[in-house]
Amino acid sequence: MKDFYSKRIEVEQYANNKKIGLEEAGRKVRYEFFEEVCNKVNANKIAVAHNKNDKVETIIMHALRGSGISGLQGIQAKTNKIIRPIIEVERQNIEEYCKQNNLEARIDKSNFDNTYTRNKIRNVVIPYIKEEFNPNIIETMIRLSEVIAEENAFLNKLVQEEYQKILLEEKVDQILLDLKKFNELDNILKKRIILYTVSNLRGGSQGIEKIHIEDIIKLCKNNIGNKFLIPNKGLKVLVKDKKIFFINEE
């Protein structure tokens, strides 16, 4: 290894400041550090060691939280700069490879702390399912995620096509959609177009929950002029002059 970079971060303090959970805080600071090093060494990819088991754990976590179908795809092999070269390899096979080649794996001790949701799924839930219901649960869940990913890709393509049909104006700080055409769409497309629009405007749709989406659909359906919603900090949705205004105020 040519260079090694490390950094000590007070995750608990970060979580408190951002008002998020410890697990999410740990993930955020980790990837912020990866991005920092990536820029420092002029790299264009960040390789992380997620494996097939991690993917299944993520699917189960998202299912327990009531995720939409996007979340049930699990971890993807590539997300922007992030690549996951061993995402299709089971943890057991990785451990066997290390053993056969006299490689000492670096194990995070916190992985055994079952107070964390992911660890409880990894150490308790999945072994229980394997023992009591389906010894091939990993492969079963992977097949499910592949079906979902295929259907989700189709829906995403459809959403992009419908979005272009109802798009009136797209600026840095606001997007305007045709109200009449939006109201004529099926509900599932309305929901996805709302998320797609917010994502285009703000670089992501974090913080936009099911209740916010339903409120926006209701606002558009009732078509009461000059009514607006603020579903998230810095985001305003306004219905006016037969248009839907998505306004980024940050």
What is each model feature region?
Residues 3, 41-44, 136, 201-205:
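Secondary-structure boundary/capping positions in well-ordered alpha/beta enzyme cores
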Residues 1-126:
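Core alpha/beta nucleotide-donor-binding catalytic domains of modification enzymes
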Residues 9, 29, 77-79, 123, ...:
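AMP-forming adenylation/ATP pyrophosphatase catalytic core
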Residues 101-146, 150, 235, 241, ...:
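Mid-to-C-terminal catalytic subdomains of enzymes
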Residues 65, 69, 131-138, 153, ...:
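Alpha-helix boundary/capping and short turn/kink residues
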Residues 92-93, 136, 211:
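Cytosolic histidine kinase catalytic core of two-component systems
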Residues 40, 128, 197-201:
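Active-site catalytic microenvironments for nucleophilic, acid-base chemistry
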